[in-house]
Amino acid sequence: MGGREWAMLLALAVLWGGSFFFNGVAVRELPSFTLVWLRVAVAAATLLLVLRLLGLHMPTEGRIWAAFFGMGLLNNVLPFALIVWGQHQIASGLASILNATTPLFTVLVAHLLTPDEKLTRLKAAGVAAGFAGAVLMIGPDALGGLGTGVLGQLACLAGALSYAFAGIFGRRFKRIGVTSMATAAGQVSASTLLLLPVMLLVDHPWTLPALRATWGAVVGVGLLSTALAYVLYFRILAAAGATNLLLVTFLIPVSAILLGALVLGEALLPRHFGGMALIGAGLACIDGRLARFLFERHQKRVVHGSLEGFDPQI
């Protein structure tokens, strides 16, 4: 990835890390499926309006809309339903660690299903270091719950696997010439339609009291953490591939913890710094440029040392 893609990845991590703040406010008045439906509905309305104001049009071909619905299913509906159900069976810390397996699944799925995102030793080492860093930041004590709630754990892992397949599936939109903004609008529009019956059946929103203090949080999570975030998501996917894109899963805990320290005054613990260091090392391994630079520097030293010991008169 180049500097532009890294900048977009960091911005995406900040937007998704910030969703914890918005969700923390919104869940006081809204059940889970109603909140996520409002989130994608606000994002869909916003992106469709922006496209209209820019004079751009959504695709009308049936095959493209079928792909939008497939993307919405893999990237929103299935993982959300699985993870929400799983979190009712296991502790939230363990659920966060299991969610951090997304890049692990992605490198494996990409290796099997794509011709250009093959697994290398350096990439495997980077993903392992990133996962270890995420575990350290969240707190290794959360792993103590591994012995219980097996079905909940499997549900969270299935959600992470769904995100991995979504990353691979979403590569097709660049191939068929759909822009990042149109793809983001199509996915959240499809997700809005897919989640509507689930939300009505599970949450019975007509029984909820009128919202008082959460509209700002709903709009914030819809505009920033969904609409803008998914435009960046599909731009990174088109430019850098699924494996690099889903490294954002390692950066979200970093973003959330730093935002908590800056905005809410939460304490930064030594394990947070250790986790950030491991995640940084993992990302550097996956990026590869630092490793190539060090290898080339070592090679130059070896060659230079050989020439110093060489006497042309012998």
Predicted regions: what they are:
Residues L49-M58, P103-A128, V254-F273:
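C-terminal transmembrane-helix exit sites in multi-pass transporters
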Residues L38-A44, L49, T214-G216, F250-I314:
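C-terminal-most transmembrane helix of multi-pass membrane proteins
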Residues L47, F69, V109, R121-D141, ...:
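Hydrophobic transmembrane alpha-helices of multi-pass small-molecule transport proteins
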Residues L47, T106-L108, L112, G144-D203, ...:
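Transmembrane alpha-helical segments that form core, pore/gating elements
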Residues L15-N23, L48-N99, V135-L136, G222-A240:
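Specific transmembrane alpha-helical segments of multi-pass solute transporters/efflux pumps
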Residues M1-W6, E29-F33, W37, T60-A66, ...:
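Juxtamembrane helix-entry segments on the extracytoplasmic side of multipass membrane proteins
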Residues V14-A45, W85, A91-G93, F165-A190, ...:
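Juxtamembrane helix-loop-helix junctions in multi-pass membrane proteins
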Residues V36-L38, N76, A95-T101, F169-T192, ...:
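Helix-helix packing/entry segments at the starts of transmembrane helices
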